């Protein structure tokens, strides 16, 4: 007998939700059933982010650095940074060099006396912000700014952190200092946006982007360094009924089992005796998938011998 020769099996959201309902002993019948299941599915993927590193969400990113800029924005869906380095001669086959950035904590970063010291960056503090943009403006511009101005006068700075990011129009601006009512040492066009002209009175919004603080700050000209990092991103949202999910095929049994357990906790027609069984099945399926979704490189532990005389 011949086999199909295909390995493309996947579940669209409609089928995934229907399978989860059947495991609860129910049938998917109404539009509300679909909406409540989709909501639970999105919550489920957020839970997975709290369980550890999901290897399929690990991505590399690069940022060209600037002279004396310590603060670098990360994509808004960043959960954490796994590793980072500063690279010189980016793209050169003969002399590209990466030097690892050592991760330090916020208290350790605060103990650095002069955070504006220049040199090749060797340390980083990862500031894991929410990525949310304020829904109401914190302040407004006083006087217009060109696309190259790095000093920005505001009506008030009372509601702004002394270091961070702001959105003006469609532009994201990084800044490292506030003096009086002015943002000084601003870095324009951050996080994939373009520096633009802004008129007086325009609203200014606080943007809580996840970011990296490096030390020392890059020495001139600055752009000889490229910040190279591996990050863990969020799992993409469930989407509509004809979409497949942002997971490898190995996690399909786990996702179905997890959604069935989530639904069993809130749907009134589920037999209460099913809930412990569905929870146990979910935990087993997640453990099976997580055990496979791991690094398989060899690790060697060597004891450190210390001698006292």
Indicate residue ranges for each PLM-predicted region.
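Glycine-enriched, solvent-exposed interface loops adjoining structured elements
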Residues: 1-136, 205-309
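Autoprocessing Asn-cyclization modules and mimics
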Residues: 55-64, 99-102, 129-206
């Amino acid at each position: 007998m011949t086999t199909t020769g295909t390995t493309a099996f996947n579940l669209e959201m409609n089928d995934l939700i229907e399978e989860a309902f059947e495991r609860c002993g129910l049938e998917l019948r109404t539009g509300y059933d679909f909406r409540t299941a989709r909501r639970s599915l999105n919550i489920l993927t957020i839970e997975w982010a709290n369980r550890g590193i999901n290897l399929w969400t690990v991505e590399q990113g690069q940022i060209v650095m600037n002279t004396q800029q310590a603060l670098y924005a990360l994509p808004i869906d960043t959960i954490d940074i796994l590793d980072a380095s500063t690279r010189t001669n980016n793209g050169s086959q003969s002399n590209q060099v990466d030097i690892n950035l050592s991760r330090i904590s916020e208290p350790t970063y605060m103990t650095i006396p002069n955070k504006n010291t220049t040199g090749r960056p060797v340390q980083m503090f990862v500031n894991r912000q929410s990525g949310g943009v304020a829904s109401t403006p914190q302040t407004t511009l006083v006087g217009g700014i060109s696309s190259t101005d790095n000093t920005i006068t505001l009506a008030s700075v009372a509601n702004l952190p002394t270091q961070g990011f702001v959105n003006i129009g469609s532009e994201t601006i990084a800044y490292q200092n506030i003096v009086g009512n002015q943002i000084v040492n601003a870095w324009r066009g951050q996080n994939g946006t373009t520096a633009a002209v802004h008129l007086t009175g325009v609203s200014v919004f606080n943007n809580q982007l996840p970011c990296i603080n490096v030390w020392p700050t890059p020495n001139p000209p600055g752009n000889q360094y490229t910040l190279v990092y591996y990050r863990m991103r969020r799992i993409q949202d469930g989407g509509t009924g004809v979409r497949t999910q942002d997971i490898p095929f190995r996690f399909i049994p786990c996702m179905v089992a997890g959604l069935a357990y989530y639904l069993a906790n809130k749907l009134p027609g589920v037999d209460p005796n099913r809930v412990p069984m569905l929870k146990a099945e979910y935990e087993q399926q997640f453990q099976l998938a997580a055990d496979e979704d791991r690094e398989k490189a060899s690790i060697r532990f060597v004891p450190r011998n210390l001698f006292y005389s």
